[in-house]
Amino acid sequence: MILTGSEIKKQVGLGRIHIAPFIEKHVNPNSYNYRLDKELLEIIENPIDPRKNNHKFKKIILTDKGYTLQPGRLYLGNTVEEIGSDYYVTSLIGRSSVGRLGIFLQITADLGHVGAKHCWTLELKVVQPVV
């Protein structure tokens, strides 16, 4: 079941959904607009060996000047918000307005466990350079 925006607000108020920080104007008719935090990690090794656990990353700090994301690269980011619930399964879905720019925000693991409350990891890939 997908909750309406008004039900999301109600459940946040009752403490059944955790969104911190919660900004009421980010509530949509059936979702909440999460935000990308200022720090990204770019995986800089090629090829990536999943048997190893010591991958090399380049840290990127996003500023008002922007940063150009490049195709063929994988960037890891986090949501600003901690999101979760002890009562509902959380689903993190990208916005169509972002998708139309050729940005994929959540490639895997879009379903959260009941009881988990955390900043979500976002896997960012672009199909064209995007600032």
Question: Model segments located where?
Answer:
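DUTPase catalytic domain/fold
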Residues: M1-V131
